[in-house]
Amino acid sequence: MPQLGLLPGRAWTVLLGLLRPPPGALCIRAVRSHSQVAEALFASQLKPHQEKSNFTIKTPKGTRDLSPQQMVVREKILDVVVSCFKRHGAKGLDTPAFELKEILTEKYGEDSGLIYDLKDQGGELLSLRYDLTVPFARYLAMNKVKKMKRYHVGKVWRRESPTIVQGRYREFYQCDFDIAGQFDPMIPDAECLKIMCEILSGLHLGDFLIKVSDRRILDGIFAVCGVPESKFHAICSSVDKLDKISWKDVRHEMVVKKGLAPEVADRIGDYVQCHGGISLVEQMFQDPRLSQNKQALEGLGDLKLLFEYLTLFGVAEKVSFDLSLARGLDYYTGVIYEAVLLQTPVHAEEEPLNMGSVAAGGRYDGLVGMFDPRGHKVPCVGLSIGVERIFSIVEQRIKTFGEKIRTTETQVFVATPQKNFLQERLKLIAELWDAGIKAELMYKNNPKLLPQLHYCENMGIPLVVIIGEQELKEGVIKLRSVASREEVAIKRENLVAEIQKRLSES
């Protein structure tokens, strides 16, 4: 007989109906009810006990656990990122892991199909957040906030095919920094790019490049090349793939799959394969076709100003004007940017290789207005750091160089060589904790000294305090350096001060 706790809801409903039949019910009713219960039980598809043993314990596809060693690496990365955000005056903010489905729909273009939808018994249609930008815009509109500089570190979810080796998952962290409010052009945008440079330099990931463009320039290119306005989004998503596939393949997609005329695709190719610095911006100002488009001229004007500010910030050499940059998300309205790591070429004449995007962002002046009942806009610009991609790179380097990672921050271990000293150890470690010293002890009444010392060596704990019968009589504590194995006797009342002194010097 199957366990009652495993009965499906339908079987319970029918069974309760059988146990409480209506007054005067005929026997034939009971017979039919028996039959219905049997059908419901068979429909439950309960697996036999022997099949249950085949169940594989694992994490869902596209997710993973992080070991203590991995958590240390991640926390160090997040410390660098968040410290930079705070250095630039950002306030912390958090939003729910899931939003009303209506909040997220029609904000991500072709990527909208990657949103996780939830079933809710309360009747609301819900979805897991796809990024941290749309919830931020909803927060601004809902709370009537007109100016804010905020950072947010949190998980997001996407139903894409995960590629673990490339650091892509279905559940992952994002670290966002955004500036909301009406300000003079390009000053907040330049600060966002400066922040990108500070973070990537601080993480010591190697050489990097920030590609920058403007959605207005891209739309202007499409217009002067003859792309129908109804195809702008579709062609934009194709151009956005140029960092992954060749122009030949992108052109094929435009013409064959999206119905663009071959000559129009060729004209687009003349533009989107260009990249350079401020000189390319000046060149585009002189372009006979692009210079006739108002949108493109506005975008080029802002980029020229942006490069002036980046020069003052001392980071202009890290930024390249790249006309192939598209950023497929629908909510971008102006400047867009993306940071990529560069692999040093084998030969001097070769160009650096693109190892993939590790940060991205842009301006989205219309997103908040989508949530405001009166359509009031709050201009915004921001960036997102790709923590998972960075984590994968750092983790691989640690494995390559065989670096050892400490999984705890313990500074002192309280040890004893003798039996029946648990009470003294507990008093001593409480004193260390109260003084703000990170300390551990072994959870045994009578531990042996050698395993305690081995534990300190394995965990990288720098100091050991040793208390025994002789030390207790003399009113001292032995302080041992794990690295040098040198021991000194310290007066009991001076122990905390001596430990703090040594830790400050290390």
From Swiss-Prot:
Origin species: Bos taurus
Residues annotated as binding L-histidine: 131-133, 158, 174, 178, 327, 331-332
Protein name: Histidine--tRNA ligase, mitochondrial
Organism ancestry: Eukaryota, Metazoa, Chordata, Craniata, Vertebrata
Gene Ontology, cellular component aspect: cytosol; mitochondrion
Positions bearing N6-acetyllysine: 444
Catalytic activity from the UniProt record: tRNA(His) + L-histidine + ATP = L-histidyl-tRNA(His) + AMP + diphosphate + H(+)
Enzyme Commission identifier(s): 6.1.1.21
Residues modified as Phosphoserine: 67
Pfam families registered for this protein in UniProt: HGTP_anticodon, tRNA-synt_His
Function, in words: Mitochondrial aminoacyl-tRNA synthetase that catalyzes the ATP-dependent ligation of histidine to the 3'-end of its cognate tRNA, via the formation of an aminoacyl-adenylate intermediate (His-AMP).
Gene3D superfamilies referenced in this protein's UniProt entry, alphabetically: Anticodon-binding domain, Bira Bifunctional Protein, Domain 2
